[in-house]
Each structure stands twice: as C-alpha cells, then as structure tokens.
C-alpha cells in the first residue's frame, strides 16, 4: 500500500462513502471501452498540452473498433456515444472555447490518468524482472547510506537521505509490490493450467508440460537467486542508516521513513518465501503428472499408441522430444544392510575379508538358479507368489534388497505376454508388512 493510500485510509470511512455518494461516482468499462480509454491516453501523451479534439478521438475509436471486429462498424454515432459515456463517468473532461469555433476539446481526468497509468505500468512491470528492480533499489539505498555516513546538517539529511528514501527507494518498493501482484496473477494462471492437464488429451497434456516446466523453473530460479541476497543487502543498508540517526531527535523523520521502508521490505521478503514454496509445489505437480501420465491410463492405451506410432513411423513420420536431465542422487544404500549391534564371537577366516558385493553376487546367483527351474519345466513365474515364499524365510530388513534381486533375475529369464496386450496387473502383497508388487506372470522365455 502506498503512503498516499495509507493517509487516505486514516480518514473516516463514512466520510469517503459520503463523498462517493455525493458525486455519484460509478465505473463501467467493458474491454472495448477500456481499450478506447488507453488509446486516448497514448495519444494524449504525444501532445504537448495533452488535449485532443473530437476528430482525434474518432480516429482512436476507429483504430480500437477495427481490432474489435465483432463490435460493429466505427460510425460517428457510435464514437460520439463512447465519448459521451466516458465524459459521464468523469473519465474525460470536455471544453468548448471561442478559439476552437464551437468544437470541443478533451482532456483526461485524474481518475482516467490513474486507471490508464495502472494498466500501462502493469504492462511495463510484467516485462521488468524482479532482479532488475531489486538491483535498482539497492543502488539507491547505497546512495542514501553513503550520505548518512557523511553526516551533516538537517538540510543535508532532508536533501540527500530523506529525499532518496522517500521519493526514490519508496517508489521502487511500490513498483516491486506491483510486480509481485503481476506474478500472483501469473501463479494463478499456472495453477489453472496444471488443473486443466487432467482434462486434456494425453498428447496435448504432455506438450503443455514442457511450457509449464519452463515457466515454473524460470520463475523459481529468479525468486531464489534474487530475493534472499537482495533482501539481506537491503536489510543491512537500512540498519546502517538507523545506526547513524540513533538518538538524534532532530532526525525523527528519517526514523519514520525507515520504519515504513522496513515494513515494505518485510512484506516483500515474506511474499518471496511464500511464492517460492508455491512455485516449488507447482513444479512438483507437473513432474508428478509426467511421471504418472502412463500409470493413470488403466488400459495402457499410452503404450499401445506408442507401439502403433513406432509401427506406422514410415507412413506417418514423427519427431521425438526428450529431456536429458541430470540424474538425482539416491541417498538410500541399495546394498544389504549389515547389522552388527549384537555381533559376538569371531568372524571365520575364510569370510573375514569378503566384500559385500561378492556376497550380493553369490546371492543373486542362488536366486537365478532357483528361478531357472521354472524355465526348465516350462512353468510360469508368478513373481508375487515367488517373492512371498522366498521373503518369508528372510529377515524383514533384507526384504527390499532381496525383492529387487528376484525381480532382476526374473526379467532376465523371460517376459510376460500380458505386457504386450497392455493388460495392467493388480497390486499383490509380498509380505506381512505392507510391501506390494505389480507384475504380470512371466510366461515367455
């Protein structure tokens, strides 16, 4: 909230309501009317006196109407109605003088300037990165800190410190606040796009994921790289100036300004942390959607379509887009856990220097020999039953690693015909501790 708005809020609310009621203020700006008002503002800025004649307003209306083809032709009658509507809403002031021979001239009212200025700034700041704005405010704060450390008369403080803080730093803080609100709108848009993924065809959904990941990653990178560092720097600069004015009653106005800036900085950094958490959540949602896109299709239609696309490649060529991301480090130790809390006695000499990998290899060989019996007899391998029987004779702490070895050895022996029919197996329990496996019966060797 700007300082001007804060001063206004301090007035009694009933007084403001009475003022609005007394002058019958009201706004009704459809998209076409708002575009017309912005066109008038652009033309006014190009004029030295910021005054426009009726002919220029008609030209602006014609430009807007051409872009809104569905609204109808740009007739003089419709243009006059639009002009009169803006005058009635106190967005345009109409003047008639003898010098213009009865023709009216028009100027934007303060209300219209406020509205158009907001939209123009909104468009500018949506393109201006947060990092640039934070760099700008840090430079201005550095000037104020340097002047404060030099010291001087009250006039020096008002000119070189208070002036910079009040009219430069504070203004940039307000711009940052506006940029944050723009990013809030962007965040809401991304949230809606993620929700729409579930309602799209799988091809469209996967294509949208690429754009969403680019947007979320770029935003996260900007927030994380700039907010924390810039926030610490600005906080240090504010504390440096406070140290210079501490205990000096003549510089209370500097203290008040610093307090207002501190509130704005706290709001910016707090918003930044919340936004980082939100964007991390959105980024994870998109990654999760990509990981589960195939599993969500219970009939394995995705796999069928992929195989069909491979078969039809020469008749209907296509491009393959893939992401080559860095592998994430898995901190879980995949090797068997050796527990020695209650180990007593001596280790046999023949295994004292035996490596754990060698133990794993021997264990995998035993599992492979066990499964080969199914292949030799031509019997199918139901991994759920095999795992349940095999794990029952081993400690619970070894179940995960042993199950991985069994599955690894089984898929080396053969495959399941059901996989090629896009049949999805059910989840089946393999121990009494909640572990489950989803695998078709291996019946082809």
UniProtKB/Swiss-Prot annotation:
<dbReference type="GO" id="GO:0009295">
    <property type="term" value="C:nucleoid"/>
</dbReference>
<feature type="region of interest" description="Leucine-zipper">
    <location>
        <begin position="213"/>
        <end position="241"/>
    </location>
</feature>
<dbReference type="GO" id="GO:0007059">
    <property type="term" value="P:chromosome segregation"/>
</dbReference>
<protein>
    <recommendedName>
        <fullName>Chromosome partition protein MukF</fullName>
    </recommendedName>
</protein>
<dbReference type="InterPro" id="IPR038198">
    <property type="entry name" value="MukF_C_sf"/>
</dbReference>
<keyword id="KW-0131">Cell cycle</keyword>
<keyword id="KW-0963">Cytoplasm</keyword>
<dbReference type="Pfam" id="PF17192">
    <property type="entry name" value="MukF_M"/>
</dbReference>
<dbReference type="GO" id="GO:0005737">
    <property type="term" value="C:cytoplasm"/>
</dbReference>
<keyword id="KW-0132">Cell division</keyword>
<dbReference type="InterPro" id="IPR033440">
    <property type="entry name" value="MukF_M"/>
</dbReference>
<keyword id="KW-0159">Chromosome partition</keyword>
<dbReference type="GO" id="GO:0006260">
    <property type="term" value="P:DNA replication"/>
</dbReference>
<dbReference type="InterPro" id="IPR036388">
    <property type="entry name" value="WH-like_DNA-bd_sf"/>
</dbReference>
<dbReference type="GO" id="GO:0030261">
    <property type="term" value="P:chromosome condensation"/>
</dbReference>
<dbReference type="GO" id="GO:0051301">
    <property type="term" value="P:cell division"/>
</dbReference>
<dbReference type="InterPro" id="IPR033441">
    <property type="entry name" value="MukF_C"/>
</dbReference>
<dbReference type="InterPro" id="IPR036141">
    <property type="entry name" value="MukF_M_sp"/>
</dbReference>
<dbReference type="GO" id="GO:0005509">
    <property type="term" value="F:calcium ion binding"/>
</dbReference>
<dbReference type="InterPro" id="IPR036390">
    <property type="entry name" value="WH_DNA-bd_sf"/>
</dbReference>
<keyword id="KW-0106">Calcium</keyword>
<comment type="function">
    <text>Involved in chromosome condensation, segregation and cell cycle progression. May participate in facilitating chromosome segregation by condensation DNA from both sides of a centrally located replisome during cell division. Not required for mini-F plasmid partitioning. Probably acts via its interaction with MukB and MukE. Overexpression results in anucleate cells. It has a calcium binding activity.</text>
</comment>
<dbReference type="InterPro" id="IPR005582">
    <property type="entry name" value="Chromosome_partition_MukF"/>
</dbReference>
<dbReference type="Pfam" id="PF03882">
    <property type="entry name" value="KicB"/>
</dbReference>
<dbReference type="Pfam" id="PF17193">
    <property type="entry name" value="MukF_C"/>
</dbReference>
<dbReference type="InterPro" id="IPR033439">
    <property type="entry name" value="MukF_WHTH"/>
</dbReference>
<comment type="similarity">
    <text>Belongs to the MukF family.</text>
</comment>
<keyword id="KW-0226">DNA condensation</keyword>
<comment type="subunit">
    <text>Interacts, and probably forms a ternary complex, with MukE and MukB via its C-terminal region. The complex formation is stimulated by calcium or magnesium. It is required for an interaction between MukE and MukB.</text>
</comment>
């Amino acid at each position: 909230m700007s300082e001007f708005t804060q001063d206004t809020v301090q007035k009694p609310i009933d007084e403001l309501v009475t003022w609005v009621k007394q002058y019958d203020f009201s706004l009704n700006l459809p998209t076409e009317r708002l575009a017309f008002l912005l066109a008038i503002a652009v033309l006014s800025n190009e004029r030295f006196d910021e005054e426009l004649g009726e002919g220029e307003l008609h030209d602006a209306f014609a430009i807007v109407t051409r872009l809104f083809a569905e609204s109808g032709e740009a007739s003089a009658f419709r243009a006059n109605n639009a002009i009169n509507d803006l005058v009635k809403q106190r967005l345009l002031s109409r003047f008639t003088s003898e010098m213009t021979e009865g023709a009216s001239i028009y100027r934007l009212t303060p209300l219209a300037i406020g509205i158009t200025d907001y939209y123009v700034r909104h468009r500018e700041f949506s393109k201006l990165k947060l990092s640039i704005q934070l760099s700008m405010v840090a430079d201005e704060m550095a000037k104020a800190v340097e002047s404060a450390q030099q010291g001087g008369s009250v006039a020096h403080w008002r000119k070189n410190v208070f002036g910079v803080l009040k009219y430069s730093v504070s203004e940039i803080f307000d711009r940052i606040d506006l940029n944050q609100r723009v990013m809030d709108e962007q965040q809401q848009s991304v949230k809606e796009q993620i929700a729409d993924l579930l309602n799209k065809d799988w091809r469209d959904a996967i294509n949208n994921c690429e754009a969403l990941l680019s947007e979320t990653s770029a935003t996260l990178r900007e927030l994380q790289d700039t907010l924390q560092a810039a926030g610490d720097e600005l906080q240090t600069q504010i504390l440096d100036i406070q140290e210079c004015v501490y205990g000096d009653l003549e510089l209370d106005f500097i203290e008040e300004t610093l307090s207002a800036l501190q509130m704005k900085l706290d709001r910016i950094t707090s918003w930044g942390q919340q936004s980082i958490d939100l964007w991390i959540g959105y980024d994870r949602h998109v990654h999760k959607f990509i990981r589960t896109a195939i599993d969500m299709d219970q009939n394995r239609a995705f796999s069928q379509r992929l195989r069909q696309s491979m078969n039809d490649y020469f008749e209907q060529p296509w491009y393959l887009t893939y992401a080559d991301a860095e592998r994430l480090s898995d901190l879980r130790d995949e090797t068997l856990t050796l527990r020695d809390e209650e180990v007593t006695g001596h280790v046999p000499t023949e295994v004292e220097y035996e490596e754990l990998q060698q133990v794993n290899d021997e264990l995998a060989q035993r599992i492979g020999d066990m499964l080969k019996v199914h292949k030799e007899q031509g019997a199918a391998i139901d991994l759920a039953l095999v795992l349940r029987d095999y794990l029952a004779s081993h400690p619970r702490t070894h179940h995960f690693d042993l199950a991985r070895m069994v599955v690894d050895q089984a898929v080396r022996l053969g495959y399941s015909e059901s996989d090629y029919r896009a049949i999805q197996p059910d989840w089946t329990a393999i121990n009494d501790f909640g572990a489950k496996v989803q695998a078709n019966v291996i019946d082809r060797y």
